[in-house]
Amino acid sequence: MKNLIYQYYLPYEAFDADIGGIEMPEWAHSGSRSCQAYAKHCNAEYELNHTRYFEHLDPRLDSLRVIYDPYFDQFDKVLSIDLDMLIATRDNIFDLDIEDVAMVHELGLHTSTSGGWLRKVMDSKLSQRGIIAYGKHLFGPGWMFPRSKLYPKERFRYLNGGLQLWSKAGRLKAREHFKSVDNYVLHTRYTEQMYINLQLSQPIFKVTELDTSWNRNSAYQWKDTPDGKINHFLARAKFTMPKLEQIYYHLLQPRE
């Protein structure tokens, strides 16, 4: 098996430009070093990219590169993981049995402080860039996001794009069946996460839901003490990553 951990860094833009400029900030270096150590632990290759694939689109859409760029066809499984995440486990994610893709539902998002924003984005009319209305435009009037299998009481499944574990078969299937990225941006102007959720709602895709320990976020799943296998530092929580990096880094060192 030839597996890859893939990350990319592109300068932040607009209202959150202070999080990272042309040079990679220290929090991003922390995330990179963490994933390099994890790749070595998992006997996987590691790649950090700085070049844009979709040069005409929002840089955050470049996480889709692992799907559309034939370069990745040489790999069996590809773990695309954001730089604002730290690995805190020795469990090998590549050992998980998946079909097309494995991701984590954002448990608690619908009822969090971001829930109002999400409802507005999702439930607005198509003319107002509504995501659900756009989904019905793509897939038919009866379409709706599926329920989470692990967390069925949630309104619908909403997968966080910060961690995506793709099989080769899944990437090739996505390349064939995902709808136009340009059309999505034209209608919604949103980023990759909602695009991926829309596309993976198609019944043809076999999505493995991982529990939240594989992508625990700082906004509403933990506050002071990260408690996941992989911890996701959203917004300005990123600036705490360098202090925690060494704690997790030692977990991944070879044991005698």
Question: What are the residue ranges of the model-derived segments?
Answer:
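A recognition module on extended beta-rich or small alphabeta surfaces enriched in W/G with H and D/E
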Residues: 244-255
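Charged, glycine/proline-rich intrinsically disordered loops and linkers
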Residues: 16-20, 111-151
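Catalytic core and acceptor-binding pocket of nucleotide-sugar-dependent glycosyltransferases
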Residues: 139-245
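N-terminal anchoring/stem segment of glycosyltransferases
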Residues: 1-76, 234-238, 255
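A generic secondary-structure signal marking the coil-to-beta-strand transition
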Residues: 1-2, 77-79, 98-101, 160-162, ...
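GT-A fold catalytic core of metal-dependent nucleotide-sugar glycosyltransferases
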Residues: 59-128
